[in-house]
């Protein structure tokens, strides 16, 4: 297989929630491989503009578009704008999401709705609009989690459930999207060192609120036989593979990316 099959030259990608963290890394990695990129954000405008600057500095084109993925009309408008600006849309990576922790007895209806609005409903309609806007042979890449179906986590039912739905979406959407030769897959990250990593990682560790940042790192790294914590670029590189011609026969799959932590 030619290495060119991993390039994305001439492609246009849109990444939701890409102003920071994993989404930013996905957008930057797509740009490094030749794609022009739409950087979506909801509130982090300054951060999104920095991601755009980085992509442009690396040699491709990029724009930032504000949209709340929980609002269907905004999602549709964002993709209209992407096609209007670049003339096409080939790759949609749905990354925007919320995290939530809470014991079963304490979870409110408002919290349930807040999380499912973005993580589940939002991703469904991002995928729907992606299907409607993508060129034939396009790519839809959703975001699940390694807590969705592999391992239960205390006080994490709402988040894990919201991501578990993604696994089912992917399997069914891959069938529906086949008529446009569009592949549908998901990445399921484990512990990834983003700007919110230290605070969130403590929730997974019994007594983690008493751990130093270094101890949190050690604990997360211990779970992986590779003995390190994941980085946003680890996710970005896998998304780039799924977006490339090299993955044209991969569809309906959920790829766990956790360094072998859950096995």
Curated annotation (Swiss-Prot):
Pathway: Mycotoxin biosynthesis. It comes from Dothistroma septosporum (strain NZE10 / CBS 128990). Disruption phenotype: Blocks the production of dothistromin and accumulates versicolorin A. The active site is at 144 (proton donor), 145 (proton donor), 159 (proton acceptor), 163 (lowers pka of active site tyr). It comes from the Eukaryota. This is Versicolorin reductase 1. Its main location: cytoplasm. It is found in: Cytoplasm, Cytosol. The lineage of its organism: Eukaryota, Fungi, Dikarya, Ascomycota, Pezizomycotina. InterPro entries: NAD(P)-bd_dom_sf, Sc_DH/Rdtase_CS, SDR_fam. It is an enzyme of class 1 (oxidoreductase). NADP(+) binds at residues 22, 68, 95, 128, 159, 163, 192, 194. The gene is ver1. Induction: Expression is positively regulated by the dothistromin-specific transcription factors aflR and aflJ. Dothistromin biosynthetic proteins are co-regulated, showing a high level of expression at ealy exponential phase with a subsequent decline in older cultures. It holds the Pfam family adh_short_C2. Belongs to the short-chain dehydrogenases/reductases (SDR) family. Its EC number is 1.1.-.-. Versicolorin reductase; part of the fragmented gene cluster that mediates the biosynthesis of dothistromin (DOTH), a polyketide toxin very similar in structure to the aflatoxin precursor, versicolorin B. The first step of the pathway is the conversion of acetate to norsolorinic acid (NOR) and requires the fatty acid synthase subunits hexA and hexB, as well as the polyketide synthase pksA. PksA combines a hexanoyl starter unit and 7 malonyl-CoA extender units to synthesize the precursor NOR. Gene3D superfamilies: NAD(P)-binding Rossmann-like Domain (3.40.50.720). Keywords: Cytoplasm, NADP, Oxidoreductase. Transmembrane segments: none annotated. One of its GO terms (molecular function) is oxidoreductase activity, acting on CH-OH group of donors.
């Amino acid at each position: 297989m030619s290495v060119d099959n991993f390039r994305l030259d001439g492609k246009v990608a849109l990444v939701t929630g890409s102003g920071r963290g994993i989404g930013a890394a996905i957008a930057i990695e797509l740009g490094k491989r030749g794609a022009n990129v739409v950087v979506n954000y909801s509130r982090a405008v300054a951060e999104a503009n920095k991601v755009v600057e980085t992509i442009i500095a690396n040699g491709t084109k990029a724009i930032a578009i504000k949209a709340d993925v929980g609002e269907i009309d905004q999602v549709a408008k964002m993709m209209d704008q992407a096609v209007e600006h670049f003339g096409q849309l080939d790759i949609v990576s749905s990354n925007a999401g919320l995290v939530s922790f809470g014991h079963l007895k304490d979870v409110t209806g408002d919290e349930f709705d807040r999380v499912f609005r973005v993580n589940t409903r939002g991703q469904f309609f991002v995928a729907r609009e992606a299907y409607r806007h993508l060129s034939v042979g396009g790519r839809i890449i959703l975001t699940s989690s390694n807590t969705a179906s592999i391992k239960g986590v205390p006080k994490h039912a709402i988040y894990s459930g919201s991501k578990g739905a993604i696994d089912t979406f992917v399997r069914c959407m891959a069938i529906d999207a086949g008529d446009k030769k569009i592949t549908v897959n998901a990445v399921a990250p484990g512990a990834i060192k983003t700007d919110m990593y230290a605070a969130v990682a403590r929730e997974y560790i019994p007594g983690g609120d008493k751990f130093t940042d270094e101890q949190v790192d050690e604990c997360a790294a211990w779970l992986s036989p590779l003995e390190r914590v994941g980085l946003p670029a680890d996710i970005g590189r896998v998304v780039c593979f799924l977006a490339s011609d090299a993955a044209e026969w991969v569809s309906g799959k959920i790829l766990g990316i956790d360094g072998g932590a859950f096995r």
